[in-house]
Amino acid sequence: MNAPFTYASPTLSVEALKHSIAYKLMFTIGKDPVIANKHEWLNATLFAVRDRLVERWLRSNRAQLSQETRQVYYLSMEFLIGRTLSNALLSLGIYDDVKGALEAMGLDLEELIDEENDPGLGNGGLGRLAACFLDSLATLGLPGRGYGIRYDYGMFKQNIVDGRQKESPDYWLEYGNPWEFKRHNTR
């Protein structure tokens, strides 16, 4: 294994978060802050927060590899994880800092949180159980991974039309999913 190189960790100050969000908007999404819409600001915020999560995730993976730790692998057809931004902010302890950074740019964090789509990865008890199981692994500090099916159109929305159930696709990936890393070499 190659030795990790030295780099500057993304900082968590309000000013650093403000710059990071604006940078992601301009250079990852390719949008001018003057004309960006709410969803583009949401994605920029998600990418900036993801950077801070990834550092911890990579450090955790590196520790597990160096110790040859056993891991739990959980396979489920569903993962009902819900919207992720507010949970990530609370887990990182940066909710108020991100809120302050966005307010300094004239944005409301709660409005952006409401803009985030629910991942179309489940809609029942099995999905909730899987999410709780993974949350328990993280809370207990146990190494583990969850595997499932990534549905392009979700688990379908169910509506009642003229007294009958009607299913329709859930376009949860309409704007992409900033939490994901595309792995073109993996199927």
Q: Where do the PLM segments sit?
A:
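A conserved ligand/cofactor-binding region detector
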Residues: M1-R187
